[in-house]
């Protein structure tokens, strides 16, 4: 699904960072939500009539059977999606008008399983089950993303953060015995 690029200048907008486990909702014209994603997912929802939008940022799709800690719920997509939708409805959005954009779900490191893929599959399935139209997505791959979303306008920009070259490691030479002078 092709992504459209934001064609407005957001330099003077009030920037609100959306960190892992958080959600933000606004109807203000001069607000932009921003987040950085790897395997996590950010869902940007928007009601085009009410001009209300929101963004969440979740780490994992669904809790495992062994996770019974209520404090960890914020990490999961099922919680993040419901909380975002409820906050938007409380501000005046209508569920049947919601539109979505999805970002993230990258495979950042081998050995961590298919976390990004599972997150993306969950988000798509959730939107389908809730009859929320998916307008755009930038999902998968192996690079991190920076996402900016103007909630009142429903516009988003997603930029891939290219892999940086590895940090050069300096060799540490241990001190020789007897190199210390005591006073």
UniProtKB/Swiss-Prot annotation:
EC number: 3.5.1.44
UniProt keyword annotations, A-Z: Chemotaxis, Hydrolase
Catalytic activity entry: L-glutaminyl-[protein] + H2O = L-glutamyl-[protein] + NH4(+)
Name of the protein: Probable chemoreceptor glutamine deamidase CheD
Keyword Nucleotide-binding: no
Keyword Cytoplasm: no
InterPro entries documented for this protein: CheD-like_sf, Chemorcpt_Glu_NH3ase_CheD, Cytotoxic_necrot_fac-like_cat
Family indicated by similarity: Belongs to the CheD family.
GO molecular function term, any single one: protein-glutamine glutaminase activity
Family annotation (Gene3D superfamilies): 3.30.1330.200
Lineage of origin: Bacteria, Pseudomonadati, Pseudomonadota, Alphaproteobacteria, Sphingomonadales
CDD domains linked to this entry: CheD
PANTHER family, per database record: CHEMORECEPTOR GLUTAMINE DEAMIDASE CHED-RELATED
GO biological process: chemotaxis
Pfam families xref list: CheD (PF03975)
General function of this protein: Probably deamidates glutamine residues to glutamate on methyl-accepting chemotaxis receptors (MCPs), playing an important role in chemotaxis.
